[in-house]
Amino acid sequence: MNLTGQEPRTQTRFVVLGAGTMGAGIAQCLADHGRWVTMCDTDAEALVRARERIATSRQTLETAGLQTAEQSREGDQRLSTTTSLADAVAAADLVIEAIPENLELKCRVFAELDRLAPAHAALVSNTSGLSITRLGQSTNRPGQVAGFHWWNPAELVPLVEVVSGESTDPQLVEQLLELATELGKQPIHVRRDVPGFVGNRLQFAVFREALHLVAEGVVTPEDLDRAMTGGPGFRWSFLGPLQAADFGGLDVFHSIASYLWQDLGDADSPPPLLDSMLQAGTLGTKSGKGFYDYTPESLNNLTERRDRFLQGLKQLVDFTRSAPASTADDDTATAKPQHRQPAA
């Protein structure tokens, strides 16, 4: 099976299972980059909503100059929908599962996909951090099962995590990495099947400390978010935390770590503040209240501003990565990481 390259774009059949926010974004990105895609959901109304969301997203991309109207029309022609799982996967080469984050549900679905999809088809999951090995074990083709985790909004955020389960075929990993690159993404290979993979482990480490600081009265939610977007988050868009430490000086970071590490705690369960918010039904944007209050109008406005920001950031990142270095020997933007083993 070949998922990449010019010719397979007219032959390879992609299926996205699940028409929620992530499924719609993934299907849109595939179709708008020349892939034939079937989006499947048992809820016909969800498919209608997904089509509407994709149309809105394409219009926004066109307005931002990231996509032409012709590309949108061609992408729309390559995207079909169905409520029949059997019909969707009958001739599939790659099935991307994007259903709710429940391991038992996903295992049942993967077992059904294993029964219905052609023997050569790869089955991959958009899970945010559930076990790829367990998903593979629910099929008779564990070597053809991998993680393929996109970030929301899928059509804008560059990161895609390609995750190896214990039995995942390395060739499938290479094909998924190449596919994601051809789709304009910034893929990474998660070599071990650990809960949360890489992105969410980093995100939740920060989230845990953010909750602690707010719960202890150190800072307000608003100032906490400003600290991140105006400080580490601002530079992390270009330099990751390890290279940022290189720039800051590892001696400086070691000095700070020597007194700060012991104060960061070792909690093994969600903080009480988060428990109390969940019990109160305070779930964030979906309930109209989280650390901030949201009305439908304010949420719509905020979402539009977020997407415009991400579009502008994507344009800047794409330009910066494609721009030639100022000198032939300037390797700052693409410095090769030094892989060091921990001291014995």
Model-derived features: positions:
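NAD(P)+-binding Rossmann beta1-loop-alpha1 motif at the extreme N-terminus of oxidoreductases
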Residues: 1-60, 64
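NAD(P)-dependent Rossmann-like dehydrogenase/reductase catalytic/cofactor-binding core
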Residues: 2-8, 185, 216, 221-344
